[in-house]
A protein has these predicted regions:
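Catalytic-core "active-site belt" of small-molecule-metabolizing enzymes
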Residues: 1-183
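Glycine-rich phosphate/ribose-binding loops and adjacent secondary-structure elements
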Residues: 186
Length: 186
């Protein structure tokens, strides 16, 4: 656990936090870890006020933090801080979308979709943080369990099939409190 919030410093902005996150990413790559993609957190506006976060954030997903499984899977929670579990829709991209991509462009870049569970963590006790803290904390990512993938082309004819592929009954909703997740593009 951290003993102090980075955001307690008045000059610690989201830009500063993302710069720190990129510096940590470079150190992890230098020691042999491989980024697999990104997770997007706080996609549910309904929880923003609770966590003092007012926009989605992103963090890197690493080869050492992801487990792919076709059935049952096991994740170790050693060395995590105050872990929580969140259901996720995990997206694999065959190409990195352009920065100004349209929804159609994003769908064209998509390769597969899979159900998943993310273990999120907070290094700040009690999950008390501001947006820059979550970015500095790797987007709160700890582990990701990715279930069986459905090819994107199998899903294009019927949008309801996306929900079925993710294990949700059509019209059944989803993870209302989930922080969001994603993988791909590395």
């Amino acid at each position: 656990p951290w003993t102090d919030r980075p955001s307690n410093r008045p000059d610690y902005t989201l830009d500063a936090a993302y710069a720190d996150a990129l510096a940590v990413r470079a150190l992890r790559v230098a020691r042999g870890e491989r980024p697999l993609g990104y997770k997007v957190g706080f996609t549910n506006r309904g929880i923003w006020a609770t966590y003092n976060v007012f926009a989605p954030i992103w963090g890197t997903v690493w080869d050492r933090s992801v487990v792919f499984c076709e059935g049952e899977g096991v994740l170790r929670l050693d060395h995590t801080c105050e872990p929580r579990i969140e259901p996720e829709a995990v997206f694999g991209f065959r190409a990195t979308p352009a920065p100004a991509a349209t929804m159609a462009d994003l769908f064209d870049a998509l390769d597969w979709v899979a159900p998943g569970f993310e273990i999120v963590q907070s290094h700040l006790p009690g999950w008390k943080f501001a947006a820059p803290d979550t970015v500095a904390d790797g987007g709160l990512h700890a582990r990701l369990l990715v279930g069986p993938a459905a090819a994107h082309l199998d899903l294009t004819d019927n949008p309801d099939s996306i929900l079925r592929a993710l294990g949700n009954p059509v019209g059944g909703g989803g993870g209302a409190g989930a922080g969001g997740g994603g993988r791909g593009g590395g």
